[in-house]
Amino acid sequence: PLKVLSRSMASASKGDHGGAGANTWRLLTFVLALPSVALCSLNCWMHAGHHERPEFIPYHHLRIRTKPFSWGDGNHTLFHNPHVNPLPTGYEQP
């Protein structure tokens, strides 16, 4: 007789499909992951606030403008933030 050369798609047709593993991951989620996210969120909230800008140092290898940008006045980057991003000449005055 000819032997069928195929294998079945499932290795086990009955039984528990990872019940103990699912309980382990559920326990790790509620005991480890969620409190860790809560502590990190609390840490970010407590340290949020206004930060002073560092002193501008005109390094010659940064903020090089070989040609103007094609938007605005040509000196500001596309997502320029005047509170954080300096121009080649220094920070903008508020």
From Swiss-Prot:
Which of UniProt's keywords are assigned here? Membrane, Mitochondrion, Mitochondrion inner membrane, Oxidoreductase, Transit peptide, Transmembrane, Transmembrane helix
Q: Where is this region: Disordered?
A: 1-20
Question: Membrane: is it a keyword of this entry?
Answer: yes
Keyword Repressor (UniProt):
no
Q: Which GO CC annotations does the UniProt entry carry?
A: mitochondrial inner membrane; respiratory chain complex IV
A GO molecular function term, named singly, is: cytochrome-c oxidase activity
Q: What is this protein called?
A: Cytochrome c oxidase subunit 6A2, mitochondrial
Which source organism does the UniProt entry give?
A: Rattus norvegicus
